[in-house]
From Swiss-Prot:
Key word Ribosomal protein present: yes
PANTHER family: LARGE RIBOSOMAL SUBUNIT PROTEIN BL17M, RIBOSOMAL PROTEIN L17
A single BP term in Gene Ontology: translation
Record keywords, A-Z: Ribonucleoprotein, Ribosomal protein
Protein name: Large ribosomal subunit protein bL17
Subunit structure: Part of the 50S ribosomal subunit. Contacts protein L32.
PROSITE patterns in alphabetical order: RIBOSOMAL_L17
Domain of life: Bacteria
Gene Ontology terms, MF aspect: structural constituent of ribosome
Gene Ontology CC annotation, any one: cytosolic large ribosomal subunit
Native organism: Heliobacterium modesticaldum (strain ATCC 51547 / Ice1)
Length: 112
């Protein structure tokens, strides 16, 4: 399956995606660049789907990716039940203009 490489080594890219996924689930909304936002949307939807499954195996899979146990608890107890009837599309990506320093396209990623 194709994915974005972000001009980073595998470990750095994986750590970046883990960090921004954890931040999104913790705060509900983050601002990042457009390519990162589009990749984050894929991963965040997978994590919320794990939360909807709700069993021990899904919880351990989420803990293997999300860095904070409190965020996993929040995901399974508060976020996942909110999307119980929704079949995917748990995140929204809104364009937020361009960053001043380097004119990178920015986006707001939020939970629907």
């Amino acid at each position: 399956m194709p994915y974005r490489k972000f001009s980073r080594p595998t470990n750095h890219r994986r750590a970046l995606l883990r960090n921004i996924t954890t931040s999104l689930l913790k705060h509900g909304k983050i601002v990042t660049t457009e390519p990162k936002a589009k990749e984050l949307r894929r991963i965040a939807d997978k994590m919320i789907t794990l939360g909807k499954q709700g069993d021990l195996h899904a919880r351990r899979q989420a803990l293997a990716f999300i860095q904070e146990e409190s965020v996993v608890t929040h995901l399974f107890k508060e976020i996942a039940p909110k999307y119980a009837t929704r079949q995917g599309g748990y995140t929204r990506v809104l364009k937020a203009g361009f960053r001043r320093g380097d004119a990178a396209p920015m986006c707001i990623v939020e939970l629907v």
